[in-house]
Regions:
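Absolute protein N-terminus
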Residues: 1, 25-26
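Bacterial N-terminal signal peptides that target proteins for export
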Residues: 2-14
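Sec/Tat signal peptide C-region and signal peptidase I cleavage site
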Residues: 18-25
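N-terminal secretory/targeting leader peptides
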Residues: 26-118, 126, 133-346
Length: 346
């Protein structure tokens, strides 16, 4: 009788332990993204985030990806994460602005001088600092900040553009972004909101004459077939994030958080590697068919940056001036700091 009772008790203990372990092994983080396989974000999820989390956790955690807006896109993904429908999501830093201003600093025009500077400063301190604020204030934590397409570059179908004065009178396609609209206007062109899907035909027909789009996307859309003059001014960095709902993040154990951050770091490195290759391939193809790909001198760049001061003034209150100043000074952009301070933007 005693042996039978002991065996039953032992079986119960084993059963409880087994099901507890099984439950622990089934921590699945559902991810919503606009990224797709064959592009840097989708490929980095597939090649780095998923396997890195599985390896770090020994199979106790996994990512369930839903690519190409199959569940949601950017802001909507963030809302679904808040509702507990998904855990992880990707977004541009600009669209994160619907949840709070913590990442607005990444979208300031000319905040970064180069892709290398953007990665270095983000990796060393800026991303961690701003993401901590996001976790505290906005209901989300960004696990990785990275580029998706690098910088926007000017392309037009009419003539060489080397300084802002060369844009005068040209009809320049813009998105609905007030920052982009202001930049184009301050540079002297006529801002013309125009749908992305119609941009190729718009440039071809002359309805619009120029555009300001990240170079690999110009290549994807084959805009270099109808716009032959390019100006490498940079300016607007295409910041993106991998984020998680704060409540779900805080519910993870310390060990689970460690596993997740290990995987997010691997994802950040991979997406940066893939993005750099995507940018280079796109720009190489554009340069091969362009009539001119012009790189302005530093004196000319100061004129392009001057056109961004109004956007910085409009953005006051969404970023910490001392933090922005530190970012600029770490890149040797003392002249731009002086321009911004003189205008009262810093």
């Amino acid at each position: 009788m005693f042996i039978k009772k002991f065996c039953k008790t032992l079986l119960k203990v084993f059963a409880i332990a087994f099901f507890a372990q099984a439950a622990y092994a089934e921590v699945t983080l559902k991810l919503g993204t606009t990224g797709r396989l064959g592009m840097p974000i989708g490929d980095a999820i597939d090649q780095a985030l998923i396997p890195a989390l599985a390896k770090a956790s020994g199979g106790k955690m996994k990512v369930e990806p839903h690519y190409q807006k199959s569940l949601c896109a950017e802001q909507k993904c963030g809302e679904q994460a808040n509702q507990g429908l998904i855990a992880l999501w990707t977004s541009s830093t600009a669209n994160y602005g619907n949840f709070g201003p913590e990442l607005a600093i990444f979208d300031l025009p000319f905040i970064f001088k180069s892709l290398e500077d953007a990665k270095r400063i983000s990796d060393e301190w800026l991303a961690e600092r701003q993401c901590k604020l996001a976790l505290e204030n906005a209901g989300h934590i960004c696990l990785s900040v990275y580029s998706s397409g690098g910088f926007r570059q000017l392309g037009n179908a009419t003539k060489p553009v080397r300084v802002p004065n060369d844009m005068k009178g040209l009809k320049w396609r813009t998105t609905k972004s007030p920052v982009e609209f202001m930049l184009v206007k301050n540079w002297g062109a006529t801002p013309t909101p125009y749908d992305w899907s119609q941009l190729y035909s718009g440039l071809q027909s002359g309805v619009v004459e120029g555009q300001y789009v990240a170079s690999p996307w110009q290549h994807v859309a084959k805009l270099h077939e109808v716009a032959k003059y390019f100006t490498e001014i940079g300016g607007m960095w295409s910041g993106n994030i991998l984020a998680m709902d704060a409540k779900q993040y805080n519910a993870l154990s310390a060990q689970e958080k460690k596993w997740l951050h290990t995987a997010a770091d691997a994802y950040g490195e991979k997406v940066n590697e893939l993005d750099n290759a995507w940018i280079k391939n796109g720009e190489d193809a554009i340069k091969a068919s362009a009539k001119e790909w012009y790189v302005p001198t530093e004196a000319e760049m100061s004129k392009w940056r001057a056109g961004a001061i109004g956007a910085w003034l409009d953005a006051k209150g969404t970023f910490e001036p001392e933090v922005a100043k530190r970012v600029l000074l770490e890149q040797g952009m003392d002249g731009f700091v002086a321009q911004l301070e003189k205008a009262g933007a810093l």
